[in-house]
Amino acid sequence: MYTPPRWNNKALKWFDERLPVLTVAHKELVVYPAPRNLNYFWNFGSLAGIAMIIMIATGIFLAMSYTAHVDHAFDSVERIMRDVNYGWLMRYMHANGASMFFIVVYVHMFRGLYYGSYKPPREVLWWLGLVILLLMMATAFMGYVLPWGQMSFWGATVITNLFSAIPVVGDDIVTLLWGGFSVDNPTLNRFFSLHYLFPMLLFAVVFLHMWALHVKKSNNPLGIDAKGPFDTIPFHPYYTVKDAFGLGIFLMVFCFFVFFAPNFFGEPDNYIPANPMVTPTHIVPEWYFLPFYAILRAVPDKLGGVLAMFGAILILFVLPWLDTSKVRSATFRPVFKGFFWVFLADCLLLGYLGAMPAEEPYVTITQLATIYYFLHFLVITPLVGWFEKPKPLPVSISSPVTTQA
């Protein structure tokens, strides 16, 4: 039974009686009952929130000095780097913040896959997380176009052209995206407007994601629900301190890239102004799109490649029903655990192959890796759930500790 806080400050008490945001914050962020056995992989959810805030804040400052015009966009970015006070810092924080954002979100997702956080009753929580990923991808792609370098221009041309593979309406969709018959100033204006809008949508979906989390509570490494107060501890101070430690490590890694390797994740060709008459030797997207780009190229047919690429993400929406096992955590599923690590290696291999040229032997290896990606979800996961014999589950979250004691 939750007991509202007693406010010693009369002003706070007066305000909270009329708009109880402080009481809600106290309930959901201070005394919120979290499983007592969460490991450091559960830090990545809060780190994703921090990364999102960094991206929104730096993006707002960059937008103040950016010019969304094909004749001035590249120069405006260079002016931000040279003439705007701390503009170089804002740009490098924003560019590297995108990579950090995707890193923590991908770790967050693979943690969910390993510990079965997509299983009932958290299906909607999982769906909202996938919507967040899709919004991140759309936002990142449009942001990559804004500097209007060679990779920006040709990346926009290649990716938007994929929609032409859609029967009947494909060409009309491409024309709508371009605002004309080629990637030009209307395209840049559209992408800048949407790049500014999508983070607000992202923030709203993150709020729903957290709401769903607090309704059905957190999963945990054992994959079993809390049986009572002995299985939980207050979020503050235990997990706020733990999250603060993780944040310190995250910021050290983030600052290393911002100050010592700001272009580590970037493409040298994007420091060349966009030129529609000169095609780069090797067009590649940002690293966080590479696995899906590899899947796109694995299928010779254009429409088939597009369907495979989008299917690689959309298949995750039905994963709660593809996994037939009653046990959530891979800790107690030895066979599934082995296949999980093979799947992780397959995803890393696809990322590597996505950066390689479309030639042998990379094409054949990419096709095999793509086949395994879909086999993992459509064949291996259901079959393992049916035939695997899991290890015995603990009686409660606290029982492994109390039994040893």
From Swiss-Prot:
CDD domains: cytochrome_b_C, Cytochrome_b_N. GO terms for cellular component: plasma membrane; respiratory chain complex III. Its cofactor is heme b. One of its GO terms (biological process) is respiratory electron transport chain. Heme b b562 binds at residues 94, 195. Keywords: Cell membrane, Electron transport, Heme, Iron, Membrane, Metal-binding, Respiratory chain, Transmembrane, Transmembrane helix, Transport. This is Cytochrome b. The lineage of its organism: Bacteria, Pseudomonadati, Pseudomonadota, Alphaproteobacteria, Rhodospirillales.
